[in-house]
């Protein structure tokens, strides 16, 4: 009985308040799909959804008024590549064999919930967790947040990462056995790949994540196609971690929905991505983050950080569909993961990506890739009321997204600093 009362008290302290009818008076409303701005709009929200948008919308009696008349309002932001349960600030954990040996699933699930509220407060109302999630812990984090037990974004999950033998464990001695199976599924034939997709779906995955080239082995076109066929039959997109080269070609021609990272993609492969409609979730690490992880190595006269910027610039110029994703796995004593995620906007600026294109990558494009475009990614009647606001025009300077002053999640105001 005491435990039940204690749990009730804890949930009462952290749970979202019930939804209410709210009228938001937006000084400027941004439509990322078109890059246009309309002034003096009223957004009416009821039961967690947007019910009306326009300059002359009349709020019903008793509706709560939210004055954002001096702000710029836009759809909630989406990070399509996160690891909310991970902290790889300890360089030993970069080898992805020690994090899940040192920490229990329970500890990492608690970290994920701790991160979730902070991530929402900086403007990300939806994130996709792409594995390394402590044995499906992110699935239960998603359910806890969806049930309103805790405050956080909508979390979409991929479950365990499907890989050729060995996962991303680098080098584990044969005496230790396949330690990586806590977070990866070894799948080395078409049948094993299909079964791995089915396993993830069974345990609650809403998307599929594969690693194509993290070892001496990489997936063939037919193997990628098998995963895509199985996932698409269940309505799930497939995203694949790959650098470039022949492995990337197999990913594109195998029909994957997106490439994650792609730091070594050539112009030829980027052009092929455009032709096939393969999105790039670019995970554009800032150079100081790479240095903290000892990953900013130089090859062919170019550091990885510079290579990332160059690849992003070329992808945009060629017309590849860009989707924003951070892959932020760090925590620092003075800065939390959510705050570090904001540094990625600077990379897009340094690559010369127009703010309108970046906003589209953060909303519309991400929603389409995640197959949630019918409920998220735009501000329109019938859409989920995931809304953020900033103090000035992000189309002029993307960096203002670091200064989110208002967050609404599913019709509930969770942050208002204006």
What are these regions (language model features)?
Residues 368, 381-418:
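C-terminal cap of metal-dependent C-N hydrolases
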Residues 88-91, 138, 218, 248-254, ...:
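Histidine/acidic-residue-rich catalytic or RNA/ligand-binding cores of hydrolases
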Residues 85-108, 165-182, 274-305, 319-322, ...:
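Active-site gating loops and adjacent loop-to-helix segments of metal-dependent hydrolytic enzymes
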Residues 71, 81-87, 211, 241, ...:
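Histidine-centered divalent metal-coordination motifs
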Residues 140, 192-280, 302-322, 374:
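Histidine/acidic residue-rich metal-binding segments in metalloenzymes
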Residues 98, 233, 306-393:
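His/Asp/Glu-enriched, well-ordered alpha-helical/loop segment
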Residues 72-143, 147-149, 222, 250-254:
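Metal-associated gating/positioning segment near the N- to mid-region
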Residues 29, 34-74:
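Histidine-rich, glycine-flanked metal-binding segment
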């Amino acid at each position: 009985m005491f435990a039940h009362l204690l749990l009730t008290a804890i949930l009462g302290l952290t749970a979202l308040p019930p939804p209410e009818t709210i009228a938001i008076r937006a000084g400027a409303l941004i439509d990322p799909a078109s890059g246009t701005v309309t002034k003096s709009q009223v957004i009416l929200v009821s039961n967690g959804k947007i019910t009306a948008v326009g300059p002359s919308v009349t709020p019903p009696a008793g509706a709560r008024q939210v004055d954002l008349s001096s702000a710029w309002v836009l759809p909630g932001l989406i990070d399509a590549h996160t690891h909310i349960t991970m902290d790889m600030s300890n360089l030993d954990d970069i080898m992805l064999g020690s994090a899940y040996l040192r920490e229990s699933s329970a500890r990492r699930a608690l970290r994920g919930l701790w991160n979730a509220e902070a991530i929402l407060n900086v403007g990300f109302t939806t994130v996709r967790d792409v594995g390394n999630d402590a044995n499906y812990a992110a699935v239960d984090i998603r359910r806890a947040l969806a049930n309103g037990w805790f405050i956080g974004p909508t979390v979409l999950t991929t479950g365990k990462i499907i890989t050729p033998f060995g996962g991303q464990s680098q080098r584990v001695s044969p005496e230790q056995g396949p330690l990586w199976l806590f977070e990866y599924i070894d799948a080395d034939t078409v049948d094993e790949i299909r079964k791995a997709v089915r396993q993830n779906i069974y345990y609650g995955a809403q998307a599929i994540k594969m690693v194509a080239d993290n070892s001496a082995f990489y997936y063939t076109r037919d193997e990628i196609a098998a995963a895509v066929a199985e996932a698409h039959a269940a309505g799930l997109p497939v995203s694949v971690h790959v650098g470039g080269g022949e492995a990337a070609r197999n990913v594109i021609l195998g029909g994957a929905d997106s490439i994650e990272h792609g730091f070594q993609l050539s112009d030829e492969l980027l052009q092929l991505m455009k032709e096939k409609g393969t999105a790039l979730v670019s995970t554009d690490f800032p150079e100081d983050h790479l240095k903290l992880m000892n990953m900013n190595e130089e090859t062919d006269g170019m550091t990885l950080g510079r290579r990332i910027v160059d690849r992003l610039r070329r992808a945009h110029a060629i017309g590849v569909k860009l989707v924003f994703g951070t892959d932020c796995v760090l925590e620092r004593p003075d800065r939390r993961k959510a705050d570090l995620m904001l540094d990625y906007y600077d990379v897009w600026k340094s690559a010369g990506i127009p703010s309108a294109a970046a906003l589209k990558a953060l909303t519309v494009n991400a929603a389409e890739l995640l197959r949630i475009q019918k409920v998220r990614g735009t501000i329109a009647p019938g859409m989920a009321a995931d809304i953020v606001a900033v103090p000035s025009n992000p189309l002029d300077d993307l960096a203002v997204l670091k200064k989110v002053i208002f967050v609404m999640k599913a019709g509930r105001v969770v942050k208002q600093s204006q």
